[in-house]
Amino acid sequence: MHIIKPVWLTHGGERKDFEVYSCDVSPDGSRLVTAAGDGYVRIWSTEAICNTNDPAVASKPKQLASMSNHSGTIHTVRFSPNGKYLASGADDKIVCIYTLDTNPPSHATTFGSNEAPPVENWRTVRRLIGHDNDVQDLGWSYDSSILVSVGLDSKVVVWSGHTFEKLKTISIHQSHVKGITFDPANKYFATASDDRTVRIFRFTSPAPNSTAHDQMNNFVLEQTISAPFANSPLTAYFRRCSWSPDGMHIAAANAVNGPVSSVAIINRGSWDGDINLIGHEAPVEVCAFSPRLYASQPVDKQAMDNQHGAQNLVTVIACAGGDKSLSIWITSNPRPIVVAQELAAKSLSDLAWSPDGKCLYATALDGTILAVRFEDGDLGYATAMEENEKSLTKFGTNRKGAGITETPDGLLLEEKSKAGEIKGVEGRMGALMGDDQADNITNEKPALLPSNAPTPARPSSPAPDAQKSQPNGTATPSAPEPEKPDPYQAKLERLKQRPTYTKDGKKRIAPLLVSGAGAAESSLPQARLMASVSNQVKADTPQSIVDLSKPFDGLPKGGLATLLFGNKRKLAQLEEDDDGHVEKRVALASQNGATPLLTNTPDGLLPARPQPAPTGQQPTPEFIRPAVTNPCMAMSQVRLAVPKVRNQILRAIDPNGKPTEPPSASGESSKSRVDVVFEARNPSAASLTGRAVDREPVRLTLFRGEQPLWQDFLPRTVLLVTGNQSMWAAACEDGSVYIWTPAGRRLVSALVLEAQPVILECNGPWILCISAVGMCYVWNVKHLSSPHPPVSLQPALDAAIHTLGAHPSAAPAITNARINSEGRIVVAMSNGEGYSYSPSMFTWQRISEPWWAVGSQYWNTTEAPVGNLQTADAQKDKDAKAAVSAGIIPFLERNTTSETLLRGRAYFLQRLIKVLLSREGYESFESSVSIAHLENRLAAALSLGAKEEFRLYLSMYAKRIGAEGLKMKVEELLKGLIGGLFEEDEAGTAQRLQENEQEDRNWRESSETLCGWPREVLLKEVILALGKHRDLQRVTVPYAKLLGVVDGESDVGDAMET
C-alpha cells in the first residue's frame, strides 16, 4: 500500500489551500474530479497522480480542466455512471450539469490567474434550480436514469438523468439531509439526515421522456431506520453513506453504539443495523465501498465459472471522519486491516474508489487531496464485474441505460405516446374541476368511464297517481320529456359542498372526494390496506353501478353458515339416552316457541300431539319454526343453513322495477317508492285436525298499494320469494319452486330440487336458486332453459382440503350470492374470496382473494364500500352491452377488503409478506404479485364480459409491463390483441366458437371485437402506452406501422384517458 500526496494536487489560494469538500472518479478511471471552497470544479489525470515519480508521465498534463460556474463553495461533485455527465452542487442552491465537448477548448487561461490552460472542454449544459438552501450531496442511479440532490433545506429532489426535468420533490426529512447513496441493483436509494434517520426509497427507473406526472407515485418511502442514530451528534458536516457492490448492505456514517461513534451496517430487506464498525474516535462522516468484490486467492475466471460462484467473495469498505484517520475494513475480518492516522490537519470530507478497486482517493478540509494505491493481495484479489452482476441477479436488477431510438418511426411513436398522456391529464383535470360538463351534454359519443368512476345516477321520482295499468300487474310510469340542463348550473352542483354539524353544533364543510383509476397511472403505485373510519356522512358523489341482482331477503349477519363433511366420516350410532338429554332439549325448544312434529316413543317415531292453544293475547312471532331437514342432507358433503319458516315474506319493487324495502319495513315515507308487493303468508296456527298433512295452505298475494291484483294458494310452506317486472317465484320447504307470470299465471310446473332452497335471487329473466346441499340452479324464464347443469358450491367452499377429513368442519360463510344480467353466478365468501361460475368452462373461477389485498401494489381499499353500489337497470341503459358485468370485480374486491380487515387476516398476511421480502429469492416478489393481480383482473373482466373494466385493466397492465421491460409479455399481449384482425376468416365463426362461448371473450379469436371493444382501438391504446419505452420499440413499431399510428396524425386522447 502506498499513500501518494502530490504537491500540485490542491485547490491553491493566495495564502492557504481551500477546503476540499468532495471528489469522484470517472467510470473509465482516467479522471479525478474535486470540488472546493474556491468555487472551482477541477478535473485531474489519475495517471499523473498515481505515477508521480514516473518521468514518462511527468511531461503529461496533470490538471485537465477547471470550471467555475458556482457563486459559492461547492460541496459535492459526481460523475454519472455512463460517463456522459458531471454534476456539482454548491451553497448557491444550484446544481450544475457538465458534459465533455469533443471540440478543443476555445479559451486559454483566465486573465490574471496562474491556472494551467485547459486540456479538455467541459461545458455547462444545465443549471438545475430546486433547492432553497445549500446542496450537500448528489447521487446518480446506476443506469444514469435519475440524479438525486439533497441539501440543508431538508429536501430530496429527483431529476431526470436524460432531460434534467424535476420529477419529484420529497420533503419527508425533518432536518438537513447530508448524504445519499444508490442501490447497485437499481431498486432503492438511501438518504441520511440530521433528523437522525436513514430513509430508504423504492423507485422504478423512469423512461427518457418521463414527466413529473408520470412519476407521481414513484420514489416512495420504503423504510425509516433510526435506531443506530438515536444519539448521534449533529456537528458532522456530512453523513455520506455507501451501498455495497453486492447490494446486501448499506454503510451509514455518523452512527453510535452506546457512547462510541461507529459505522452502522444496515442489512438489505430487513433494514436492521445489528453490525457496527467501531474504532474511530470522532464521528465518521463518509463511508465508501469498493466497487469490486474480492477473493482471498488469485481469481481464475474459468475456475470461478466451474465453481458457480462457490468461492466466498468479500467486500471492502473505507471510512473516514473527524478524527483525521482512514480505516479500511473487509467483511471477513472483524477488525480493520488498515488504519492510517493524521492523514490531514482537519477532517476528511470525501472518499472515492477507482473502478478497478486498486486506488482510493481522499479529500480533507485542510485542502489535502491524496491517493492510496494498493498492490495485489493487499485487500484481496479483485474479481471481474461479472461477479457483481451475478450477485445482483437475485434482486431482479435492471441496470441498463435507456436505448436510442433506431428509426424515425420510433421517435414519432414516442412523441405521440407522450402527447396522448398530456392530453389525458388535461382531460382528467378538466373533469375534476367540472369543465367537461357542457362537453358531456353536447357530445353524442358516450364518455368512457372506468368502473369505479362516479357515474351519473337517474333521480327517482314518486309514482304518479294515474298510471297506465298493464295486464302483467306492473305500471309504466309516464316519462317526461328530458329538459336540456344548464351547463353552468350543473357545474355548480358538481362543485357544491354539503355542510355537516358536529356533536357540539359546529358547522363543518365535507369536501367532495374524487376517486378513480387515475392513481394507477404510474408504473409503481402504492398499496395501502386501511379501514374506513368515516361513514357518518352520506357521500354526495353519484353511486357506482354494479350489474348484479339486489338482495331483497338479506342473509344473516356474518353470512350463510356452511358445513363440510369428509369422505371418511362415520355415521353416529344410536345409543340409549340415560340422562334424558333429548327430552330436556325438546322441552327447552318448546319454551322458545318451537312446535314438535314427531315424538320419540318406545314404539318408534309418532306424530306429536297438538299442544294446547295459549291463552291471552300473544305477539306475532318473527318466525314460526325451523324448516324440516331433508333426509338427503344426511349424506351430503355440503350443508348450508336453512332459513326458518316465517309468518310473512314480502318482496317489493318500485315503479322502475327495482327491488325496494316493503312499506312495513321502511315506514310510511317509503310507500311512495313502492309500486308492487308480493306477499307469501304461512299459516301460524296448528293443524285443525291434528294431522300435519291437514295444515292450512299458504296464501300468495300480489298487491299494488292496498289493492290485490291476484292471489294463489300452495299446499307447502314457503321459505323464500323473489320477483321483478318479468315474473314472480316462490321456493317451498319441500324443495319445490313455483314461477308465475306478472299476471299470476303459472309459467311452468313446480320445479323440484333435492333439498330446501336457501337463496333465491332474480335479475331480469334469470333466476338463481341455491339449495341446502350447495347445488346452484340457474333458469331463464324467457326461454325456459338453463345455461348449464346444476353446479355444486363445494369447490368454492375450500372442500378440496377437507375431503379426507373424518369430522365436519366449518367452511367459509356465504356473504353474497347474486346473478348478473347474463345469468352468471357471483358468490362472495366470509374469508374474503369471490367466485364466478363460467358456463363455457363449467368450473368456478376465483376472481378475488386476500392474497392480492396485501401483496399487490394495485389494490385499492380507499374507495366506497360495497353498500354504496347500486344495481344497474340494463334494460333502460342506452348501451345495455356496456352494463354487462359492470362493477362485479370492484364489488368482490371491496368485499375482500372488508372481510380481511374484519377478521384480522390483513395483519398476519402483511407480516408474512414483510418477512418474505427480506429473504433471498423473493426480491421481485412485490412486482411479480402486482403484475399477476393485473393479469387476474384482466382475465376476470374478459370472462365476465365487463367492458369498461377490461379496457381500464388492459391500460394499467400495458403500462406496468412496459415499465418493467417485460418484452416477452408485451409481444404476447400485442399478438393476443391483434388476433385474426388482418387475417381472412377461412374456418368460419361456427368452427371457431365452442358451445356456450361468447364470440369476443377469447384472445385467440379472429373476431373484430374483444370484450365489446374493437380490437384495433385496444391495440392502438396499448401501442401508445408502450411507445415511450425505447427498449420495446422493436416490438411496438411494426404494430404502429400496421395501424397507421406513425404515418399521420391520429387522435390519441381517448387512448390515454383510461
Swiss-Prot record:
**Highest taxon of the lineage:** Eukaryota
GO molecular function list: nucleosome binding
From the UniProt entry, list the residue stretches annotated as the region Disordered. 427-488, 590-618, 652-672
Q: Per the record, where are the segments of Polar residues compositional bias?
A: 467-477, 590-602
Keyword Magnesium (UniProt): no
Q: Does the keyword DNA repair apply?
A: no
Where do the WD repeat units fall? Answer: 15-54, 69-108, 130-169, 172-211, 233-276, 279-339, 343-384
GO cellular component, alphabetical, reads:
chromatin; HIR complex; nucleus
Record's protein name: Protein HIR1
Which organism encodes this protein?
Aspergillus oryzae (strain ATCC 42149 / RIB 40) (Yellow koji mold)
